[in-house]
Amino acid sequence: MPVGSLRAAAVLLLGIAQLPPSSAAPRNGSKWTYVGADGERSWFKKYPSCGGRLQSPIDLHGDTLQYDASLTPLEFQGYNVSADKQFNLTNDGHSVRLNLPPDMYLQGLPSRYTATQLHLHWGNRNDPYGSEHTVGGKQFAAELHIVHYNSDSYPDISTASNKSEGLAVLAVLIEKGYFNPYYDRIFSFLRYVKYKGQNVRIPTFNIEELLPEKPAEYYRYRGSLTTPPCYPSVLWTVFRNPVTISQEQLLALQTALYFTRADDPAPREMINNFRPIQNFGVRLVHASFQEVQILPGTGLSVGIILSVALAGVLGICIVLAVCIWFFRRKKGSKKGDNKGVIYNPAIKMETEAHA
């Protein structure tokens, strides 16, 4: 090789060796995070869709809701997974993920949507509000997402993920309350997937048991993935009714996991892995039920408040009517006291007249 070529190669290698550390991939392998330089506010720089249209999550409130009688109950096919199989539970560096079998799918949507995985979003022990969607401004403790792809049109989730309505996600809102034995079938294994990249095989169970009561009541809208690349490809179904988990179960979720690998010198707790509410724009949210509006700060429906107000006005009218009736009756009785009294003017006796 000519000397000039060797010299050029040496310069090139030296230049590569002197590249700044920031050009290397992060040690934990993450291309994005929820906070810091690669946090949610910077996602759009690497993933343009994150700053684009139809982004999720959103706040579900009365001004955007429209009742849609065509929204029928979903059919959950293959959700009761055979006991002779196993689920794979893994820490993917962003959440805890449960991989789902390909014979699990949804019916009742425009196409058949096959399940691929489920995962959760949550807050932290000091601020235990970590749901992504909110309802009337109310944020819940956590949120479960069951992810499906349009298997009628696409061969796999990778192909479907950036297509219009290529994905369908079921969202379950989770609040603190009673112990939930169904969710514990996931939570009891969290200690085995403490760090990114760890996984464990766990017994199968009926995924439908993770859904809330009255699953026929839900919100439906077109939105996006809530994590990069944020493709606006999701047909969202957010169930109206939340499920509960206990304080102990919520604490386990908030403290058991790390974003980082076991050998990372700067471990980071997996907390606050939720995206803030996004601009709603001109979209509509369709509801499969007739919405009962709740007046903020009261916990009472608008209908109940209007009924109470109407009853109060009616009560005042009745009181006024009774008062007027008594007043008129009293006035009439005074006039009646003078009846039968004959007024005779004084007549001077004739004897007095001729005195």
From Swiss-Prot:
Q: Which residues bind Zn(2+)?
A: 119, 121, 145
Q: Where is the signal peptide?
A: 1-24
Q: List all annotated glycosylation positions.
A: 28, 80, 88, 162
Q: How is its activity regulated?
A: Inhibited by acetazolamide.
List the disulfide bonds in this chain: 50-230
Entry annotation: catalytic residues: 94
Q: Which Pfam families match?
A: Carb_anhydrase
Q: What is its EC number?
A: 4.2.1.1
| Gene3D superfamilies on file | Alpha carbonic anhydrase (3.10.200.10)
Q: Is Glycoprotein among this UniProt entry's keywords?
A: yes
What is the required cofactor set for this protein? Zn(2+)
Q: What is this protein called?
A: Carbonic anhydrase 12
Q: What species is this protein from?
A: Oryctolagus cuniculus (Rabbit)
